[in-house]
Amino acid sequence: MLNRFFGPRRAAQIQRAIRNGKITLLCLVMTVVVLRGMIGAGHFGTPEQDLGLIQSHLGNNRRVLEEVKQSSSEGGAAEKEAQTNPNSYEGFDINKILADEEPEEEKDPNKPYSLGPTISDWDEQRAKWLKENPHFPNFIRPNKPRVLLVTGSSPKPCENPVGDHYLLKSIKNKIDYCRLHGIEIFYNLALLDAEMAGFWAKLPLIRKLLLSHPEVEFLWWMDSDAMFTDMAFELPWERYKDYNLVMHGWNEMVYDQKNWIGLNTGSFLLRNGQWALDILDAWAPMGPKGKIREEAGKILTRELKDRPVFEADDQSAMVYLLATQKDKWGDKVYLESAYYLHGYWGILVDRYEEMIENYHPGLGDHRWPLVTHFVGCKPCGKFGDYPVERCLKQMDRAFNFGDNQILQMYGFTHNSLASRRVKRIRNETRNPLEFKDELGLLHPAFKAANLSS
């Protein structure tokens, strides 16, 4: 038909163009179908709905950015509120109330140091007081002296976030032992003499307590980083009837070798009397901080076996005092090694499970140590001598090891030595007094009152 109007050649060109147009149109339709399937047209079936879905997808990124911005803004506002809200502990600067109000009193460097006025008749004064105050006897019953356990820590918070928590565990542990054994306890937070800071702070405190409590027969000093791990062990008081100072140690290491770790002053017993005042006066001169302590440290390092170079400490000074003046003091000093009045944690803590399996409380020695002492961990300081994680984990284990002996009286125990959680180990009963206390800690014989008088 086209040949009639355009001629053969022109008609062929038009027919070819129509065929190409059909192909182009078909390709266009296929492209639209594919694109609609890819962007979700099949979900809704109408262009308007497809457009809405596309817009919603494109808007997500903006929404996320706006939410992050809003969250950041809210977090900043909360932080700002914590810093400005007077009721918030988080934003409070603790240094505002910890700052010392007055400078330390300066001491005369030319004046010899003294713990206090010289007292030479304390035995007579004390005997008179005890006679005039019969309701405060120095012995609760025969072979059971009145004992005051003394411990303490810095008047300021610890220098790390968890130190005070471990101090709390430590004093709770000591309270438990003292309650079971009829021992009084004194916790000190005051630095009584600024010159005797650090290792030496215990000496002025001990002297003051001995003089203020003549009814106390033995004062038991115990460092804050030491814990009781045998709640059932009662000290063999009869063994010490002729001694005035009891420390964990070995005679040969102190008197023969002059080894600076031949004894430990982290846990010791001191009998109240003139002898105690005299040895405190002899012990103290190396303690004043500054040049005296530094120079004394050099002497101790030179004279004592294997001692590192550092300022004078109370333990090294005691070793030096006993080794160089054995004739004066040695007869009244008992170096105890039959049980752990002090037990170095490094050789004990990994054996707790073995002890539980094979032994029982009440032994006090390597089989079930009375005291586990975390020497060098310094849980209240910024840095210790051992990895922090190991120290804290093992302090938790030591606390739980001792605490289990308390909890078992009431039917509970820790899930494990590493766990704060507890579990029930016996069922409740309507006859609770029929329960048999296997360790004998609920009503121990060593706590029974003496009613003979």
Stretch-by-stretch model annotation:
Residues 154-156, 192, 226-227, 251-253, ...:
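Short, solvent-exposed loop/turn segments at secondary-structure junctions
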Residues 185-187:
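A structural preference for short, hydrophobic beta-strand core positions in alpha/beta folds
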Residues 24-31, 201-204, 208, 275-452:
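Catalytic core and acceptor-binding pocket of nucleotide-sugar-dependent glycosyltransferases
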Residues 168-183:
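Short, acidic, metal-binding catalytic loop of nucleotide-sugar glycosyltransferases
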Residues 155-166, 195-196, 298-309:
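Short, flexible/disordered intra-domain loops and linkers
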Residues 1-166, 383-453:
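Juxtamembrane luminal stem/stalk of type II transmembrane Golgi/ER carbohydrate-processing enzymes
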Residues 125, 136-140, 174-176, 209-210, ...:
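Beta-strand elements of modular eukaryotic interaction domains
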Residues 2, 192-193, 198-277:
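GT-A fold catalytic core of metal-dependent nucleotide-sugar glycosyltransferases
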